[in-house]
Swiss-Prot record:
Catalyzes the reversible formation of acyl-phosphate (acyl-PO(4)) from acyl-[acyl-carrier-protein] (acyl-ACP). This enzyme utilizes acyl-ACP as fatty acyl donor, but not acyl-CoA. InterPro entries: FA_synthesis, Phospholipid_synth_PlsX-like. Its EC number is 2.3.1.274. It comes from Helicobacter pylori (strain ATCC 700392 / 26695). GO terms for molecular function: phosphate:acyl-[acyl carrier protein] acyltransferase activity. This is Phosphate acyltransferase. The keyword NAD does not apply. It is an enzyme of class 2 (transferase). The gene is plsX.
Length: 337
């Protein structure tokens, strides 16, 4: 298995990315291609790691403040070169750089799975149960039609089943109330269409995401990104409040010591790094979009995520799901025959 790693564009430079690759190679067997500035990367690559990786040198990358469309023109940028390597035989790509550039190039260079109108960003959300919830779209498509959300539901269902090994996953539609009549026009129209699928649970509220009421939560990319960023902010704020209160008195410090195991579990379940990155579902190869602020642990987990996606053949599974569950795709196949 060959995994392409975009070294460029992450908030903290190349070091966390290289450290994440090194840690993953200690636990998993895979080949990797690092794409980026060799001069910046070499000081952090040990002789042992150098013997395990291939390095493709380029100094160009798409900066966060640049338009995503720049990636199409910049054929020597790290993400363009990486996407070409993926297209021509590699199995997966991971990037903590410009997410818009990654999404755009993945769609253009790899192509969409047949029947998919819009690829979606899929992210894992912590829940009170033993397994996280899947949320999509988390930001790829701010303006959506009901048909797009149907695609998201099918892809999320298949990802939960194939990659996460959830048995008979249930899909919920994010709304401002669980009743069928709640929601804006997009939600109401999507709800009518989703009723045709056995996996559809119904409408869910924002709080249900973290209760584990359903396995997959579907929404447009605008709402999904707001949910994601709000969750990150709340988790960070709660962590800061805990730290301040623990430091406030000797009694609090002793109590925290007694609850250390519980706090460790809470931290692990709410730490974005433990979830790796966000798969871009709907394109013809596995692409993982990592957070710009990813540390070494986040990159390491993103690699494990990519390996699971490739081993489970999720792209093929989504293709098959669309052929069997989406009427327009199966009808098209019959006409072609």
């Amino acid at each position: 298995m060959k995994i392409v790693i975009d070294l460029m564009g992450a908030d903290h430079g190349v070091l966390p990315v290289i450290e994440g690759v090194s840690r993953a190679l200690e636990n998993k067997s895979f080949s990797t291609v690092l794409v980026g500035d060799k001069d910046k990367a070499t000081p952090f690559i040990s002789k042992e790691l150098a013997s395990k990786v291939e390095m493709i040198h380029t100094q160009d990358y798409i900066k966060m403040e640049e338009a995503a469309t720049e990636a199409i023109k910049r054929k020597e940028s790290s993400i363009y070169l990486g996407m070409d390597i993926l297209k021509n035989g590699a199995d997966a790509l991971i990037s903590a750089g410009h997410s818009g550039a990654t999404m755009g190039l993945a769609t253009l260079r790899l192509g969409r799975i047949k029947g998919v109108e819009r690829p979606a960003i899929c992210t894992l959300m912590p829940s009170v149960g033993k397994r996280p919830s899947v949320l999509l779209d988390a930001g790829a498509n701010t303006d959506c039609k009901p048909e797009y959300l149907i695609d998201f539901a099918l892809m999320g269902y298949e990802y939960a089943k194939s990659v996460l090994h959830y048995d008979s996953p249930k899909v919920g539609l994010l709304s401002n109330g669980e009743e069928d009549i709640k929601g804006n026009m997009l939600v109401k129209e999507t709800h009518k269409m989703l009723k045709a699928y056995d996996f559809f649970y119904g409408n869910v509220e924002g709080s249900d995401i973290f209760k584990g009421v359903v396995d997959v939560v579907v929404c447009d990319g605008f709402m999904g990104n707001v949910v994601l960023k709000t969750t990150e902010g709340v988790a960070s704020a709660i962590g800061s409040i805990f730290k301040d209160e623990i430091k406030s008195s000797f009694k609090s410090k002793m109590g925290a010591l007694m609850l250390k195991n519980a706090f460790d579990i809470l931290k692990q379940k709410t730490d974005y790094a433990e979830y790796g990155g966000a798969p871009l579902l709907g394109v013809n190869k596995s692409v993982i979009i990592s957070h710009g602020k990813s540390n070494a642990r986040a990159i390491e987990c993103a690699i494990y995520q990519a390996i699971s996606a490739v081993e489970s053949q999720v792209c093929l599974r989504i293709t098959q799901a669309f052929e069997s569950l989406k009427p327009s795709v199966s009808q098209s196949d019959q006409q072609d025959a």
